[in-house]
Amino acid sequence: MNPSTETNPVAADAFSAENDFLSSVITSSDTDSRLNPIPERYRFLSGSMLKLIACITMLIDHIGAYLVAHNGPVLFKLRGTAYTWYTIYRAIGRIAFPLFCFLMVEGFLHTRNRFRFGRNRLLFAIISEITWNLIHSNKLFMPGSQSVFVTLFLGYLGMCAIYYLRDNIPRMSLALIALMGISYLIRCDYGMKGFCLLVALYLLHRARIFQFAAGCGYLNSLTKSGIGFFAFLFYNGKRGFIRGRWKYAFYAFYPAHLLVLWMIKYKVFG
């Protein structure tokens, strides 16, 4: 207990109430409908639809980053059009990362086994690292940067720190600072900003409007990533059509599409 509260019952009650409130916010998987400006009847996006949108926009983003950026003159014959297409592809692709973070938070909140949830994300992070290295350097090992799945896994560890250390704020804070430092040092995709975004979405999961505001504030790019954050408001809380083992196809899509793009980039265009 805080030493200052031992001789002050009023302060002790306030400290206890603050801890109880924080604990209820962290442990509850429910969303307060009053904190979503979109009426429930208009919330038409299921988790499966959000996954589909995330995958499609990510694919568009990576086509722009890895094919158009390096092979513009081949893909687009007219001079000057490659940069225009590159900009369009990357702008559309900015929608994907906020959705991946949001889905990660929703998965953490509703999973029945948080250890297995994290283990699966770690496994896909390791697999994805191979294709990430190939697409960036045409080598199996490239320590200079890490894939977005590493960022998401660090976000998972951050959510675990908040959930399991919620009664020990100093230890929780140290754990989060350490994870922020790791995300910066190993140069994860989206870096420390991406890690902080995921943690913020978790802390604000009961209020969709606050998630939207925090997301736009973090990425400071309403015209690009803002569309992804708007999708939060239309989420209906339902799983949708992707069920059972098919959910792993969503995660396998990331390394699989990078592998295909690597083959096109290096084997077709050279």
Features from the language model and the residues they span:
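Alpha-helical transmembrane segments and their immediate juxtamembrane cytosolic regions
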Residues: M1-G270
